């Protein structure tokens, strides 16, 4: 395990600046004294686009490659046309760094606002494919803007891409106590892509006899996320279904404000990126109202990815304890929550 961390920091837009500052505060507090943390901040996002028209210049993309990991705050602003930052920055990073795993843990923490509160058995992970599906830009339109317009959005699925994400999901399931993996797709209608996923899943399953498996159509999975979340341990699915399911998973386990995520390159060829799921919330930016918990939990994912398991667990324990003590009667600022978590992980 490396005894130094070279971290790229992209605060981004809106509340991103505030929550990233708290994530770094907790990171500095939890690391052992013999671990050297170096950070470099990158000015990317809406303000940069307004000033220069740049989203992610090639020079900065090249510089980002040299870091061990990336911590991202939030990207997006209503003053920027939809899709400019999403495709020009976030998706460009994801594809350039081959982040083929989007990792989204879903765990019910104590004292959280959800209709499923009081069910301690909600603890699963969604492994979403990150570089294929309908997000590759494979499509187009004819006779655009006319009553006869035709639009296509093609979902790209390759045997190579599917197998590597399925294999990663089996590895994660094998390392967890329950050792269960569920494939989610819609192979009764999406027969070509669906059969590629199911056949690959079944082939790889033969190499992991210790992992129990099952399959669900995506519509059934959405029902069970709400009615039987305890049935899930690790879930693997494609890019589009995963995008939808992970937000539902966040809702049933306490809300997007507590949801962390990792865009992972498991090979280590490129740095992985970790970020809270929530948006930039420009309506509350700069007011100290943003809860940095999701960013702090993203820091835990980052540490675990880099091999700092004990430190990651301390952050998660601190978050659990902090949430358990919240009663809603006193509103704390962003800084106050970050300070409290930093004290807990350092003690």
Curated annotation (Swiss-Prot):
Listed InterPro entries: ICDH/IPMDH, IsoCit/isopropylmalate_DH_CS, IsoPropMal-DH-like_dom, LeuB_actb
Residue numbers binding substrate: 94, 104, 128, 219
Swiss-Prot/TrEMBL cofactor(s): Mg(2+); Mn(2+)
Localization annotation: Cytoplasm
The protein's Enzyme Commission number: 1.1.1.85
Residues reported in the UniProt entry to bind Mg(2+): 219, 243, 247
Nucleus is among the record's keywords: no
Residues reported to bind NAD(+): 279-291
Primary localisation category: cytoplasm
Any one Gene Ontology cellular component term annotated for this protein: cytoplasm
Gene Ontology biological process terms, A to Z: L-leucine biosynthetic process
Subunit structure as annotated in this protein's UniProt entry: Homodimer.
Task performed by this protein: Catalyzes the oxidation of 3-carboxy-2-hydroxy-4-methylpentanoate (3-isopropylmalate) to 3-carboxy-4-methyl-2-oxopentanoate. The product decarboxylates to 4-methyl-2 oxopentanoate.
PANTHER family: D-MALATE DEHYDROGENASE [DECARBOXYLATING]
Stored HAMAP family: LeuB_type2 (MF_01035)
The family this protein is said to belong to: Belongs to the isocitrate and isopropylmalate dehydrogenases family. LeuB type 2 subfamily.
Name of the molecule in the record: 3-isopropylmalate dehydrogenase
Originating organism: Streptomyces griseus subsp. griseus (strain JCM 4626 / CBS 651.72 / NBRC 13350 / KCC S-0626 / ISP 5235)
Upper taxonomic lineage: Bacteria, Bacillati, Actinomycetota, Actinomycetes, Kitasatosporales
């Amino acid at each position: 395990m490396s005894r130094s961390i070279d971290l790229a920091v992209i605060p981004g837009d809106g509340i991103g600046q505030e929550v990233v500052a708290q994530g770094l505060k907790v990171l500095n507090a939890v690391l052992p004294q013999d671990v050297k943390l170096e950070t470099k901040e990158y000015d990317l996002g809406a303000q940069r686009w307004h000033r220069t028209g740049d989203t992610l210049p090639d020079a900065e993309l090249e510089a980002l490659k040299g870091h061990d990991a990336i911590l991202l705050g939030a990207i997006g602003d209503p003053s920027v046309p939809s899709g400019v930052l999403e495709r020009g920055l976030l998706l460009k990073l994801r594809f350039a760094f081959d982040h083929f795993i989007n990792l989204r843990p879903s765990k019910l923490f104590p004292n959280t606002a959800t209709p499923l509160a009081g069910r301690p058995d909600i603890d699963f992970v969604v492994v979403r494919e990150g570089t294929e599906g309908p997000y590759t830009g494979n499509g187009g339109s004819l006779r655009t803007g006319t009553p006869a317009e035709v639009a296509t959005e093609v979902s790209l699925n390759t045997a190579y891409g599917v197998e590597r994400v399925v294999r990663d999901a089996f590895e994660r399931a094998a390392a967890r106590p329950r050792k269960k993996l569920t494939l989610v797709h819609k192979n009764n209608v999406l027969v070509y892509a669906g059969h590629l996923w199911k056949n690959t899943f079944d082939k790889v399953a033969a190499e992991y006899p210790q992992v129990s498996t099952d399959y669900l159509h995506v519509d059934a999975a959405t029902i069970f996320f709400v009615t039987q979340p305890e049935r899930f341990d690790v879930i693997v699915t494609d890019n589009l279904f995963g995008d939808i399911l992970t937000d539902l998973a966040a809702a049933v386990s306490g809300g997007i404000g507590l949801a962390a995520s990792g865009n992972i390159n498991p090979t280590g060829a490129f740095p992985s990126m970790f970020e809270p799921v929530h948006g930039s919330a420009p309506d509350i930016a700069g007011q100290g109202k943003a809860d940095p918990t999701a960013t702090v939990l993203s820091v835990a994912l980052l540490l675990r990815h880099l091999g700092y398991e004990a430190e990651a667990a301390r952050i998660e324990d601190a978050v659990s304890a902090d949430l358990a003590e919240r009663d809603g009667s006193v509103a704390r600022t962003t800084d106050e929550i970050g300070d409290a978590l930093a004290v807990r992980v350092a003690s």
